[in-house]
Amino acid sequence: MYILPAIDLKNGEVVRLVEGNYDNKTTYFKDPLEVLDFFIESGSSYLHVVDLDGASDGETINFKTIEKVIKKCDLFVEVGGGIRNEDTIKKYLDIGVKRTILGTAAVENIDFTNNMINKYKEHIAVSIDSRDRMIAVKGWKEINKQDSVEFCMKLDSMGIDTIIYTDISKDGKLSGTNLDIYKELREKISCNIIASGGVTFEDEIIKLRDMKINGAIVGKAIYEGKIDLKKIIEIAKQ
């Protein structure tokens, strides 16, 4: 298992939202390069980056900022937010992004998703963001009525390499993640699963690791000093 520290970008700044609410945000750094050095020094091999403006508007608003991050580090970087066509996938892969994350596009256009999975294979992940088991899209502003676990099973049958699953109700609250949903997912799908949303405590990392979850995205818990990044990276590897 591996840890992906998170950088969420809004207008080029590193922020965290609570339950995906764009009006409830905290700005931690004006420049993502400030926190990138800390991630590298802590032993990170992976980085999760989200263009929050892109997730909401469907445009790659923070592309130049993300390109700056890529040039500064040698990490495995995955990027999501506003990736809704193949040109954007190519654009990110061309600057050195290792994995591009489909969200809204995956839910709203399953044929496109299937084509991208077949063409780009491990360079494509799908992010499933769930509220009360239903899928949220467009920066979590709209609820799609599909059952999130059933949709994950559909993606798994299509050959998706990696699913990132977020329980929105837990996100940004520092109250822990939804371990039950990851247990259910691991029992029902065989692809790689990355846990996201509310991961706050060391014992959660141990439990996720032991249930064979492949990765965990950690954001606010790092920024607020609730968790030791260096330590959880080592725990995840055990």
UniProtKB/Swiss-Prot annotation:
Pathway: Amino-acid biosynthesis; L-histidine biosynthesis; L-histidine from 5-phospho-alpha-D-ribose 1-diphosphate: step 4/9. Its main location: cytoplasm. GO terms for biological process: L-histidine biosynthetic process; L-tryptophan biosynthetic process. Its EC number is 5.3.1.16. It is found in: Cytoplasm. GO terms for cellular component: cytoplasm. It is an enzyme of class 5 (isomerase). It catalyses: 1-(5-phospho-beta-D-ribosyl)-5-[(5-phospho-beta-D-ribosylamino)methylideneamino]imidazole-4-carboxamide = 5-[(5-phospho-1-deoxy-D-ribulos-1-ylimino)methylamino]-1-(5-phospho-beta-D-ribosyl)imidazole-4-carboxamide. GO terms for molecular function: 1-(5-phosphoribosyl)-5-[(5-phosphoribosylamino)methylideneamino]imidazole-4-carboxamide isomerase activity. The keyword Amino-acid biosynthesis applies. Keywords: Amino-acid biosynthesis, Cytoplasm, Histidine biosynthesis, Isomerase. The active site is at 8 (proton acceptor), 129 (proton donor). NCBIfam families: 1-(5-phosphoribosyl)-5-[(5-phosphoribosylamino)methylideneamino]imidazole-4-carboxamide isomerase (TIGR00007). Belongs to the HisA/HisF family. This is 1-(5-phosphoribosyl)-5-[(5-phosphoribosylamino)methylideneamino] imidazole-4-carboxamide isomerase. It comes from Brachyspira hyodysenteriae (strain ATCC 49526 / WA1). The gene is hisA.
